[in-house]
Amino acid sequence: MSFTVVIPARYQSTRLPGKPLADIAGKPMVQWVYEQAIQAGAQDVIIATDDQRVADAVAVFGGKVCMTSPNHESGTERLAEVVQLMGIADDHIVVNVQGDEPLIPPSIIRQVAENLAASSAPMATLGVAITSEEEVFNPNAVKVVTDKEGYALYFSRATIPWDRDAFARGEVLTEHSLMRHIGIYAYRAGFINTYVNWQPSSLEKIECLEQLRVLWYGEKIHVELAKEAPPAGVDTPEDLELVRKIIAAKS
């Protein structure tokens, strides 16, 4: 099985400007993500950016860059442009890895690609069991429920499924563990163009979850439990400092 990893890396960030180039132990953040993707065994790793500063930094460490439009409204639109510009075949597997996850385990990058390869779905993703009571009711921890074959039934910021009897007894964490969605996706390349040409659905607007568009239009997303739970990504200066400390401790 061969697959390509695309890493969107926008320079502008409201809470952390210049995020892809943030220094972590002497390397820009985007290089850490790139190296994790290489370790996953990807055939090709492409960094998609709309900023020359990011492109220049990637050239320094020998990565591959695809310059994209600054006008995309979503990461998936940027992904579709990469597929078109790089001439990626319709049946090829493309994994979208966020550019702000320098500690993402290579094992789950490969796992989501293998998940899609073993499925008839056009798209695959991963989840982890929720083990924290805070996460159960946290709208930023997106939940996913699946059918018996592992295909997503719904994604929500709400607490799903709602364990009526357990919650009535005051039991939040039960043996019927909820699953938190991890924002890593594998696509069949030809499906990406189909996806971005669909009009946004009412459900995705309500939940602010773009993946609901796929279910709305009757397509499937296969979900597996991740082999490893990835550390949190970098959204704020505080997150960045935490990642720096983790990497410093490892070295």
UniProtKB/Swiss-Prot annotation:
ATP-binding listed as a keyword: no
Where it sits in the cell: the answer is: Cytoplasm
Any GO BP? CMP-keto-3-deoxy-D-manno-octulosonic acid biosynthetic process
Per the UniProt entry, the Enzyme Commission number(s) are: 2.7.7.38
Q: Which reaction is catalysed here?
A: 3-deoxy-alpha-D-manno-oct-2-ulosonate + CTP = CMP-3-deoxy-beta-D-manno-octulosonate + diphosphate
Q: Could you tell me which SUPFAM superfamilies the record lists for this protein?
A: Nucleotide-diphospho-sugar transferases
In terms of domain of life, where is this protein from? Bacteria
GO terms for MF: 3-deoxy-manno-octulosonate cytidylyltransferase activity
Principal cellular location given in the protein's record = cytoplasm
> CDD domains, alphabetically?
CMP-KDO-Synthetase
Q: In which pathway does it act?
A: Nucleotide-sugar biosynthesis; CMP-3-deoxy-D-manno-octulosonate biosynthesis; CMP-3-deoxy-D-manno-octulosonate from 3-deoxy-D-manno-octulosonate and CTP: step 1/1; Bacterial outer membrane biogenesis; lipopolysaccharide biosynthesis
How is this protein annotated for GO cellular component? cytosol
Enzyme class, one word?
transferase
Q: Which UniProt keywords apply?
A: Cytoplasm, Lipopolysaccharide biosynthesis, Nucleotidyltransferase, Transferase
Q: Does the keyword Nucleotidyltransferase apply?
A: yes
Family from the record: Belongs to the KdsB family.
Q: Which PANTHER family match?
A: 3-DEOXY-MANNO-OCTULOSONATE CYTIDYLYLTRANSFERASE (PTHR42866), 3-DEOXY-MANNO-OCTULOSONATE CYTIDYLYLTRANSFERASE, MITOCHONDRIAL (PTHR42866:SF2)
What job does the chain carry out?
Activates KDO (a required 8-carbon sugar) for incorporation into bacterial lipopolysaccharide in Gram-negative bacteria.
Name this protein carries in UniProt:
3-deoxy-manno-octulosonate cytidylyltransferase
- Could you tell me which species this protein originates from? Vibrio vulnificus (strain YJ016)
**Lineage of the species this protein comes from:** Bacteria, Pseudomonadati, Pseudomonadota, Gammaproteobacteria, Vibrionales
Gene encoding this polypeptide? kdsB
